[in-house]
Amino acid sequence: MKVNPPLAWHPAPVSAPVDLHWWLTHRGSLTRLIQDRCEHFRVEPIFQALATACIDELEVMNLRRQTRALVREVYLRCNETPVVFAHSIVRKEHLRGAWRGLSRLGNQSLGTMLFTNPLIQRTPLAFKKLKPHHPLFERACKRLQNRPADLWARRSLFILQHQPILVTEVFLPAIRRL
């Protein structure tokens, strides 16, 4: 199944604002970058349940349309301001395998876990400018006072024991002030 062009993610953040480009393309831990720029960093869990994937996640996660997977969504907060909306998805059967601890993370950072395990491999980043019709745009903006016209996001797979988790990070307007 091919993803339709409007749903496509791109290998480079072409046309991304200059002040976001560095954030988007940094391959290290986004959690660590934000922590280094904040007095108080916090992970705020907002959703975690078995749910269906977004349509543009199906192919990359090798999921059928109605298959349920574990979806985890959090805000990364800097001094209580949300700066990133993070969305991760892992196949249900992998919760008994490589990703068995994921469902118990609570307000702990997934990024810390991903970047401290040397066995985890990461695929290249993919980028997209999310518009209001994209489901992740809607969820990312749920607690924002002012909705922007669009939001930039990046995603990649983290693979442990041949089992992937897809992590998407949506950059909220406040990230530009860090």
Curated annotation (Swiss-Prot):
Pathway named in the protein's UniProt entry: Cofactor biosynthesis; ubiquinone biosynthesis
Chain ranges passing through the membrane: none
Residues holding substrate: 72, 110, 169
Top-rank taxon, per record: Bacteria
Keyword Cytoplasm tagged: yes
Organism: Nitrosomonas europaea (strain ATCC 19718 / CIP 103999 / KCTC 2705 / NBRC 14298)
Family note: Belongs to the UbiC family.
EC number: 4.1.3.40
Protein name: Probable chorismate pyruvate-lyase
SUPFAM superfamilies named in the record: Chorismate lyase-like
Entry-linked PANTHER family: CHORISMATE PYRUVATE-LYASE
Predominant subcellular localization, coarse grouping: cytoplasm
Pfam families: Chor_lyase
Gene Ontology biological process terms in this record: pyruvate biosynthetic process; ubiquinone biosynthetic process
Function per UniProt: Removes the pyruvyl group from chorismate, with concomitant aromatization of the ring, to provide 4-hydroxybenzoate (4HB) for the ubiquinone pathway.
